[in-house]
């Protein structure tokens, strides 16, 4: 090393000191002043851990006055360098800048600058960086992205729907799985995919007030999505940050009532720019052609301004056929433009169902089937497709063609891509329902009060009287006052106490229609037998309800009984219990199904006992018999219940209003016959279509198997532990697939993404995570991994390295240069660029003659043959071959151009294939539905041309490099 006063050097071991200046030199030592950090260092001359900073032609450097110079020439005189070039701010040419006047705070951003400046990292960090780039790329390209990292069981039909919908641009769908099939999880998976891919950045979830907290917790626990609940208080607090409070958070959760009640809040929600709207319990959105409900109008206004919309309802035709059409109209007003046309189209489902069944069966297509398909797809030339099906070609190709025809049929002639509905009949693994009808004698106190109420209720409508007669305890209280203790003589209470005593170790869910009944029942159980119970009703706050639900769920020391009013049977799930008591009966079959669905859902491991105590000779007995014998609504799910009820509602109400069984037998017979007929119709037409479309068949099973195969990925485990080590996190193995991760004092950063201040317990095993709520399931999608990768890449970890290759087959001193380039298209995340051209790493391995050996030398196996070099020695090695490294980088820059072009071509082809498919679909739809807007077609064409331009302008940047020197020692 030769030193001269004024030379600029950088410390190999303390790179944060900035750029140093030689201020004193004697025979044995050199003194360097680091002005940026106001530090002085004295080094031994012969082995100083510092590196001379030199810049080259093409570099941009900064003067201590703040202006920059693009270097065109470098002159050395008396050991000092002078840079000549053009000022970037004034374009003045031939400007001279002596190295002494360089900025003290100079930063080396290019990996080659860092390498030459002695900022050399460890080789294990270089390997970590390359793996981070590779994994980031693979995750972006993974078609199952957003599905693998959720903390939920791998249930095929849920995965299929989420996969089908989640990868669409601006999905607009109605998720209408039957009660208990997991719509909330499906919605969460769709949101997760949309957010991860950048297709949705701002998401609004609108739910009934009672379900806000449940959604908040589900999104956070299962998907690591942190929503904010917005109410009046939160909106007022947010005014300091924005005029529109809904602009202050990206992921927002609020109740429908909240935005329906306030005109101002409603307008603010509509004005906020959402990418995705999710509405739960969408069957509350009533509509008819003359007068839509306020709730419907509110959601319609938001849906018109929002690209993606998910509506969730357990009962697609609940509240009538018109409301079902209206919900579909919210999603796709072009496809569902006229109610009468919709009704007419539904009548034509049968031939479509037959054609789909023929295609799905895999059997040879009959001429009739072919003619039917050709007629239904008249705008498409299907003959070539039939020829492929009948040829001796590969099974895979035939299967693809059959699937293409099925997709086209369903898209154009059914509710297609808009409605997904799975039924229990199609999903295996549900428990049996065991019904226990318990007739009981009517107490004289009730008989008297009911008789008097009948005499006094002369002006009451039949419906109001029928409703009243179902709840004798309420009638009794009206006469006796609030202090009346009906539960002292009601035989249902005595029976219930005995049931609970006999089943002390069972959790029992009790549902009553009224909140007052639920509260008094809890009091009776507590006072008479000291039974631990908790109540759940509409008068409680969300937090109080959550506490009640948690107390019931608690295994040790928890409540034996949870008593819910009717609202308790919407949205809350208690599949850990299998005992359901209906203290009274709801007025319609849909509510009955909702009640049973709290226990009878996916995840229920045992058969369900449904206990229905009723008072003989009252409306309760008549309704129980009609539900049981007319609909079999207790024994199995009843999708036809609403239609049967509407057909016979006048008769049912008249019978319930009198409380007499005259006319009950014929009503039961006619109801059972109609129910059977409707079920047969559903079996024939639309439901079979939807079943084929919604449960995914073998595709769904394959999807679940693929995701299961990625669980516990050993590459992920190794990468995560290596990442945590590099960042400086403490890891404590707790056994049973669990590791406790906590922040450490000497971390690379002050706080680690996704890691709480107090640390957390992690597992890589899905089964363990599902059984232990206190654990984080770590996957490639988890914020601790995603955030860690971002941290490594932005903090420059592993951007340079020097390694030794001990190989006597090569001459000692042979050089290899490993370069990692990244292809990056600068485009908005929403454009979908990440799907076709995410940041793409390209590895080159240049030998000393400028040949690229990367195809012959695989990274991991080569990395295992290398040995590390300490930083000081590495810096010396780099300095001794600086000229050769420059030459190899220049050669690599030429080689990389061909590789970039190939990446651009592949990305463009993939994008055009995907988007042309969508364009063709809309053009075909336009042929059968003139209401498809031209803008929709131009939107896709515009998107294709924009993406094509972004891909064409994709640039490459050298991200990291490693010098490898052959050694024989």
From Swiss-Prot:
- Tell me the subunit arrangement: Interacts with the RNAP. Has a higher affinity for the core RNAP than for the holoenzyme. Its ATPase activity is stimulated by binding to RNAP.
Q: Where is the Helicase C-terminal domain?
A: 492-672
Which Gene3D superfamilies does the record cross-reference, listed alphabetically? 2.30.30.140, 2.30.30.930, 3.30.360.80, 6.10.140.1500, 6.10.140.2230, P-loop containing nucleotide triphosphate hydrolases (3.40.50.300), Tandem AAA-ATPase domain (3.40.50.10810)
| Binding-site residues for ATP, renumbered to this chain | 177-184
E.C. code: 3.6.4.-
Tell me which family the UniProt entry assigns to this protein: Belongs to the SNF2/RAD54 helicase family. RapA subfamily.
Q: What does this protein do?
A: Transcription regulator that activates transcription by stimulating RNA polymerase (RNAP) recycling in case of stress conditions such as supercoiled DNA or high salt concentrations. Probably acts by releasing the RNAP, when it is trapped or immobilized on tightly supercoiled DNA. Does not activate transcription on linear DNA. Probably not involved in DNA repair.
Span(s) of short sequence motif DEAH box: 280-283
Protein name per the record: RNA polymerase-associated protein RapA
Domain (Helicase ATP-binding) ranges: 164-334
Which molecular function GO terms apply here?
ATP binding; DNA binding; helicase activity; hydrolase activity, acting on acid anhydrides
Which HAMAP family does this UniProt record tie to the protein?
A: Helicase_RapA
User: GO BP, one example?
Assistant: regulation of DNA-templated transcription
What is one Pfam family matched by this protein?
RapA_C
The entry's keywords: Activator, ATP-binding, DNA-binding, Helicase, Hydrolase, Nucleotide-binding, Transcription, Transcription regulation
């Amino acid at each position: 090393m030769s030193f001269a006063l004024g030379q600029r050097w950088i410390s190999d071991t303390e790179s944060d000191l900035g750029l140093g200046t030689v201020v004193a030199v004697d025979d044995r030592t050199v003194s360097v002043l680091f002005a940026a950090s106001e530090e002085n260092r004295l080094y031994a001359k012969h082995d100083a851990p510092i590196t001379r900073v030199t810049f080259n032609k093409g570099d941009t450097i900064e003067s201590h006055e703040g202006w920059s110079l693009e270097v065109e020439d470098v002159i050395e005189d008396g050991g000092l360098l002078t840079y000549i070039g053009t000022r970037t701010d004034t374009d003045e040419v031939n400007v001279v800048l002596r190295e002494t006047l360089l900025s003290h705070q100079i930063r080396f951003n290019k990996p080659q600058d860092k390498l030459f400046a002695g900022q050399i990292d460890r080789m294990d960090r270089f390997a970590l960086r390359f793996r981070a780039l590779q994994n980031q790329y693979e995750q972006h390209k993974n078609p199952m992205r957003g599905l693998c990292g959720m903390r939920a069981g791998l249930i095929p039909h849920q995965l299929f729907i989420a996969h089908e919908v989640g990868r669409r641009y601006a999905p607009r769908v109605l998720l209408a799985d039957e009660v208990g099939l997991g719509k909330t999880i499906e919605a969460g998976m769709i949101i997760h995919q949309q957010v991860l891919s950048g297709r949705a950045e701002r998401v609004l979830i609108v739910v009934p007030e009672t379900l806000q907290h449940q959604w908040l917790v589900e999104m956070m626990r299962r998907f690591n999505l942190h929503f904010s609940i917005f109410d009046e208080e939160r909106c007022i607090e947010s005014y300091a940050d924005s005029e529109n409070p809904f602009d202050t958070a990206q992921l927002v959760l609020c109740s429908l009532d909240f935005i329906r009640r306030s005109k101002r809040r409603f307008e603010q929600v509509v004005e906020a720019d959402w990418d995705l709207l999710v509405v739960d319990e969408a069957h509350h959105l009533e509509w008819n052609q003359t007068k839509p409900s306020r709730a419907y109008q509110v959601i319609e206004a938001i849906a018109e301004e929002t690209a993606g919309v998910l509506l969730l309802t357990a009962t697609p035709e609940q509240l009538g056929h018109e409301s079902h059409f209206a919900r579909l109209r919210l999603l796709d007003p072009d496809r569902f433009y006229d109610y009468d046309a919709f009704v007419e189209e539904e009548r034509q489902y049968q031939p479509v169902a037959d054609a789909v069944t023929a295609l799905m069966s895999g059997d040879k297509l009959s001429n009739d089937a072919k003619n039917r398909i050709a007629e239904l797809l008249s705008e498409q030339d299907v003959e070539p497709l039939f020829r492929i099906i009948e040829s001796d070609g590969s099974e895979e190709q035939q299967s693809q063609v059959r699937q293409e025809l099925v997709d086209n049929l369903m898209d154009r002639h059914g509710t297609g891509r808009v409605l997904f509905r799975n039924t229990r009949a199609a999903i295996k693994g549900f428990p049996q329902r065991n019904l226990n009808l318990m007739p009981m004698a009517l107490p004289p106190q009730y008989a008297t009060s009911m008789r008097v109420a009948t005499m006094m209720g002369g002006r009451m409508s039949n419906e109001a009287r029928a409703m009243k007669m179902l709840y004798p305890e309420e009638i009794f209280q009206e006469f006796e006052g609030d202090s009346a203790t009906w539960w002292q003589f009601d035989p249902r209470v005595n029976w219930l106490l005995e049931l609970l005593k006999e089943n002390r170790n069972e959790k029992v869910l009790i549902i009553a229609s009224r909140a007052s009944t639920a509260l008094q029942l809890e009091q009776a159980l507590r006072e008479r037998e000291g039974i631990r119970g908790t109540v759940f009703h509409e008068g409680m706050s969300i937090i109080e309800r959550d506490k009640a639900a948690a107390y019931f769920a608690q295994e040790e020391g928890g409540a034996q009984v949870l008593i819910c009013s009717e609202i308790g049977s919407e949205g809350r799930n208690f599949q850990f219990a299998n005992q359901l008591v209906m203290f009274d009966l709801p007025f319609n079959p849909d509510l009955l199904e909702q009640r049973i669905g709290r226990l009878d859902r996916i995840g229920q491991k045992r058969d369900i006992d449904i206990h229905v105590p009723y008072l003989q000779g009252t409306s309760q007995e008549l309704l129980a018999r009609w539900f049981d014998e007319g609909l079999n609504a207790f024994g199995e799910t009843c999708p036809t219940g609403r239609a049967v009820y509407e057909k016979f509602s006048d008769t049912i109400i008249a019978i319930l209003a009198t409380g007499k069984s005259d006319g009950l037998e014929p009503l039961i017979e006619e109801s059972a016959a109609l129910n059977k007929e409707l079920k047969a119709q559903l079996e024939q037409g639309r439901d079979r279509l939807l079943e084929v479309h919604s449960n995914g068949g073998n595709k769904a099973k394959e999807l679940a198997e693929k995701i299961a195969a990625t669980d516990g990925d050993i590459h992920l485990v190794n990468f995560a532990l290596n990442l945590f080590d590099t960042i400086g996190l403490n890891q404590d193995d707790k056994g049973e697939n669990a590791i406790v991760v906590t922040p450490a004092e000497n971390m690379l950063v002050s706080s680690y993404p996704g890691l709480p201040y107090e640390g957390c317990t992690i597992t890589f095993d899905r089964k363990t995570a599902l059984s232990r709520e206190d654990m984080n399931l770590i996957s490639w999608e988890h914020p601790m991994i995603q955030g860690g990768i971002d941290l490594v890449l932005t903090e420059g970890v592993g951007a340079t390295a020097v390694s030794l290759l001990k190989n006597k087959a090569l001459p000692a001193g042979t050089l290899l240069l490993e370069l990692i380039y990244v292809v990056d298209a600068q485009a908005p995340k929403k454009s979908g660029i990440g799907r076709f051209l995410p940041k793409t790493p390209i590895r080159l391995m240049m030998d000393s003659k400028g040949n690229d050996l990367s195809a012959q030398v695989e990274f991991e196996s080569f990395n295992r043959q290398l040995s590390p070099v300490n930083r000081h020695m590495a810096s010396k090695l780099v300095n001794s071959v600086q000229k050769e490294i420059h030459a190899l980088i220049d050669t690599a820059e030429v080689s990389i151009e061909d590789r970039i072009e190939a990446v651009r071509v592949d990305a463009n082809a993939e994008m055009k294939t995907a988007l042309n498919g969508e364009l063709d679909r809309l053009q075909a739809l336009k042929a059968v539905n003139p209401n498809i807007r031209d803008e929709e077609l131009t939107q896709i064409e515009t998107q294709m041309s924009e993406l094509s331009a972004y891909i064409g302008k994709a640039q490459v940047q050298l991200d990291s490099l490693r010098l490898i020197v052959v050694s024989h020692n």
